[in-house]
Amino acid sequence: STLMRSSAASDVYKRQFYRRGFFVSKKRYAVIEDGEIIAKGLELVRRDWAPIVKQTQKDVLKDILKEGNTTKAINTVKKVLKRLKTGKIEGKELIIHTQITKPLNEYKQIGPHVVAAKKMEEHGIKITKGTIIQYVIVKGKGSISQRAVPYDYSEGAEYDRDYYINNQMIPAIGRIMYSLGYTKQDLEDLAQGEKQTSLDAFF
C-alpha cells in the first residue's frame, strides 16, 4: 500500500540519517567518522558525568548512528537502568569528577564537589584551585550536595539509585531519545519497568 511504501521509505531515510550524525544544536552533536563516534558538547565527553552514564550514551549513539537500530538502543538503556535500580553498578562507574575553581571558602553555592572537597580536607588532604574532586552520591538524609562523598572514602556506602537514574542517566539519554519522539515520562516509566511494550512498539 502507499502507506506501507511511505513507511518503508521513511525507515530507510531514518537509517541513513542516523548513520551520518545526530545533532542537538550547533554545539552539541555526535557523528560517525571512520566507524568511530565523534561527539561535542554531549555528556560522554564531559567529566562531570558518571562513567556509566557516558558509556551508556556512547552505546546508544552507536546503536542509532552506526547500526540504525533504535530497538537495540532502547534495550541498551533498559539493561543499564535495571542494573542501576538493583544496585549492581560498581562504585568506580559512578564517580563524578569536578574541578575546584577557587578557594573553598569563596564558594557561595555549596555544590556536591565542594562538600566532598571539605570532607577530603577533614582527612588531611590539601585542596587547592585546580584540584579534581572525585565523588559519588550516596543514599541517606539531606540534600544531594550533603550526600556527596569522596570516592576514596565511600567504601561500604550505598549509592543513591534515584539520583543516578533521575539526575544522571535520564537527562543524558533523554538528550538523544527526546529527538526521536520519546518523552521524559517514557524514560521514567522505563526506569520503573512500566509501559515497556508501548516503548518497544514506538518504531
Annotate each predicted stretch with a short phrase:
Residues S1, S7-F203:
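DNA-dependent DNA polymerase catalytic subunits
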